[in-house]
Structures are given as C-alpha cells and as structure tokens.
C-alpha cells in the first residue's frame, strides 16, 4: 500500500462537471489499494476575481490589510475542498475537507507570501486509519497570531509538496491542464517535446526560470525530501506524464533539458554610496522577495537586481523609505525585460555553447543585456518583446528534440 498525494489545479475544478470528472482519477488510485490525500486549488479565475475585489477597496500596503487580503483569497480553495468532499460522498466514498487551521499548517507572519514552519499530521493519519480521504484546501496556513496566511501564487503546489514531505508520501501527483513538462513553451513551440523524466535540480531551475507547470517552492521541497512527483493532465491521464525524480547524470556531457522564459520580472537599478552590494541584496531579499539575478554594476555604488514583478509595489515602498532615509540615492524600475533560460546538466563546461548562442542571437538582432551562468543554467536578459523569437532561435539552434533526453 502506497500513500499518494493528489493535487488538482484550478482548471481541473473550474466547474461542478469538472469536479465530478476527477472522481474516476481518485477512484483509480484507491482501486490500486493505495491511500490518498487530496489538495485542491480554487476554481480557475476565482483567485483573480478576489484579488480584483480586494484592490477595489484597499491599497494593501499595510500588514493589517494584507491579513484581511489573505482571508479573502483563501476562500476560493475552501469552497473547492468542500465541493469535492460532497461529490465524493455522493459516490459513497468517505471524504472530508480540511482547512489550514484545522490541521494546523503553521506559517510565519509574512502575509500573502508566507513560509510554512510545520505541518501537524495527526488528523490526517486518523483519517487514513478510518479510510476517510482528507481533502485539504491548498494555498493557506495559519500563523502564531491565529491569522490566515496565504503562501503566494502557486501556493497549492507548495501545500501538496509539504503534505507529501510531512506524511512521507510515496509520490505526489500534480494534475493540471497539460500532459507534463515540455522542453519549451508549447504556445511558442507547438511541437515542443514532452519531457518524460527529469531530475529534481533541473525541474527546480525550470520552475525558477518561468516554467508555469510547477511552482518553484514545490520543486524545492520535493528535491529536499526526495519525493517522486508526477505532472499529468486531468483531462487525459492516460496520455503519460513527466516524472520528477532523482537519477544519476553524466556531468561532463552537455544535455539540454529545456528552454523557458519569464516576462513577469522587474529590473531594479539602485545607487548607493552608504550601503554595499551585500547589504542592498539583503534588504531586497527581505519579506521573502525572490532575487532571480543580481549584479554589482559599479563597485560600492550601482547595483542591479531582477525580481518578480508581483513584488513591485512592496519594493517601491521599501526603496522609497531607504531613499528618504538617505541610505540610497536613487532607484529605477524597468518592466520591459524578460529572461530566457537554457537548462541542462554540465552546460557550464561546454566552452563553445555560450559563444554559439550569443553569435546566433546577435545575427538575428536580439540584444542580450546580461548573461548569468551556473552549473546547469544559462540566463539571458533581453527585451520582453523578443522572447518568442529568442526561444524559437534557441530551440532550433540547440536541437533539443534530438538530444534524446527530452
């Protein structure tokens, strides 16, 4: 008997009809004599509607306002969890919903992008012993002040991964509207090849670099706890999947796993003579702000950072306060940027790869503003209007579909 965590995304539960159609998927796992715990997202579009409503009544720039914002946003997952429990009960399957405070899932105090500190598994284990399927409302936790705190966009993926880790699950399945992870965005490369198997570190880099199929926090958790994860389609579960797992790599051989892009970025330039590079980076990273790329443009004077566009408002408030306190002299924001990332083990050791890439892009009049290289990733900073052309160029140039890995 295995323990399987099943997470159903927003498109999988958009309507009552779709909620009913995931029941055979749950039944199929039960028929294998496996135990199942389910995590659900809000119905597709609901969270966006709730965000819009909150923005209409509040500036959302104070902690007390963000606390209420979290209460509003978490309601979408609560509705889905109860509806799925009702649907399963109609099929004579014992099921019950759980909200974050009932387990509890404990978080820190960073409203709207909280980090989970612990997951109590006692109630979940009791349910499994009684053959009751727990259905957990994703995306939410509760802090030490007994306030709901949401985990940020993609938070239901994070919830599923955390439950899998806490319960020592055998596998975590993420059901979405695509059949797995692709070597490039199918909207740009319609014939992009599906990756049948990918290791944890590559998946994490793809997620960090803009791949929408899995949130980076979830990828990081399953890598840390070595939990196999599958990405598969709710609407075609028989069409195969992508397995995210641990496997040996030949580090000296360049194997390109995929290309991903991210337009939802903010390029920040900061000038300061009183704060050094590390001090500025530490300030930017506070409150769980993710830094994609950082660079010291001019020693002890000018620094640049690439962060998530969603952090723009909070960072503007933060940097304005620093400027008013004379800790920095100036800052600028640029939102017309994007990154294109090439992921693959050992690519740093291929000395000709970067030369070939930059030569090809220059020939096609694509201006690469910045390059950052790690062991398994090359990041290119470009204008956001050149993303599609860049991805097309690189997919053709690197012949990803012919590597045998994807």
From Swiss-Prot:
Pathway: Amino-acid biosynthesis; L-lysine biosynthesis via DAP pathway; (S)-tetrahydrodipicolinate from L-aspartate: step 1/4; Amino-acid biosynthesis; L-methionine biosynthesis via de novo pathway; L-homoserine from L-aspartate: step 1/3; Amino-acid biosynthesis; L-threonine biosynthesis; L-threonine from L-aspartate: step 1/5
Keyword Kinase: yes
GO biological process: diaminopimelate biosynthetic process; homoserine biosynthetic process; lysine biosynthetic process via diaminopimelate; threonine biosynthetic process
Pfam families reported in the protein's UniProt record: AA_kinase, ACT_9
UniProtKB keywords: Amino-acid biosynthesis, ATP-binding, Diaminopimelate biosynthesis, Kinase, Lysine biosynthesis, Nucleotide-binding, Transferase
Keyword hit for Lipid biosynthesis: no
Reaction(s) this enzyme catalyzes, per UniProt: L-aspartate + ATP = 4-phospho-L-aspartate + ADP
GO cellular component: cytosol
Enzyme Commission number(s) of this protein: 2.7.2.4
Record domain ACT: where: 342-406
Enzyme class, broadest EC rank: transferase
Record-level Gene Ontology MF annotations: aspartate kinase activity; ATP binding
Organism superkingdom: Bacteria
Family statement: Belongs to the aspartokinase family.
Protein name as catalogued: Aspartokinase
UniProt source species: Rickettsia bellii (strain RML369-C)
Gene assigned in the entry: lysC
């Amino acid at each position: 008997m295995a323990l399987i965590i099943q997470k159903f995304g927003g498109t999988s539960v958009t309507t009552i009809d779709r909620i009913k159609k995931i029941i055979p998927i749950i039944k199929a796992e039960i028929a294998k004599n496996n135990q199942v715990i389910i995590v659900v997202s809000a119905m597709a579009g609901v969270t966006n509607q709730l965000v819009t409503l909150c923005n209409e009544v509040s500036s959302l720039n104070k902690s007390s306002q963000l606390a209420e914002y979290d209460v509003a946003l978490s309601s979408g997952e609560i509705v889905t969890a109860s509806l799925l429990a009702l649907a399963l009960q109609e099929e004579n399957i014992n099921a019950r919903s759980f909200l974050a405070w009932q387990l509890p899932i404990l978080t820190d105090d960073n409203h709207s992008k909280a980090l989970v500190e612990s997951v109590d598994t006692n109630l979940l284990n009791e349910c499994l012993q009684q053959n009751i399927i727990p259905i957990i409302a994703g995306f939410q936790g509760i802090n030490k002040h007994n306030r709901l705190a949401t985990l940020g966009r993609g938070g239901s993926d994070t919830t599923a991964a955390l439950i899998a880790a806490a319960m020592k699950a055998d596998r975590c399945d993420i059901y979405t509207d695509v059949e797995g992870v692709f070597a490039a965005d199918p909207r740009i490369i319609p014939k992009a090849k599906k990756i049948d198997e990918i290791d944890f570190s590559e998946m994490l880099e793809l997620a960090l670099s803009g791949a929408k199929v899995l949130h980076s926090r979830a990828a990081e958790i399953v890598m840390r706890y070595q939990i196999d994860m599958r990405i598969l389609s709710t609407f075609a579960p028989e069409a195969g999947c992508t397995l995210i797992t641990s496997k040996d790599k030949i580090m000296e051989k360049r194997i390109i796993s995929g290309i991903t892009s991210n337009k939802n970025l903010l390029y920040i330039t900061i000038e300061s003579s009183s704060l050094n590079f590390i001090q500025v980076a530490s300030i930017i990273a506070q409150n769980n702000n993710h830094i994609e790329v950082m660079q010291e443009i001019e020693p002890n004077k000018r620094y640049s950072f690439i962060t998530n566009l969603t952090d723009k408002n909070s960072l503007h408030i933060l940097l304005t306060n620093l400027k008013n306190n004379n800790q920095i002299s100036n800052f600028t924001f640029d939102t017309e940027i994007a990154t294109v990332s090439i992921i693959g083990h050992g690519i740093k050791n291929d000395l000709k790869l970067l030369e070939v890439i930059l030569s090809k892009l220059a020939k096609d009049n694509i201006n690469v503003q910045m390059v950052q290289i790690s062991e398994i990733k090359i990041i290119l900073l470009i204008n956001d209007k050149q993303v599609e052309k860049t991805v097309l160029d690189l997919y053709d140039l690197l012949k990803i579909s012919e590597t045998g890995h994807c």
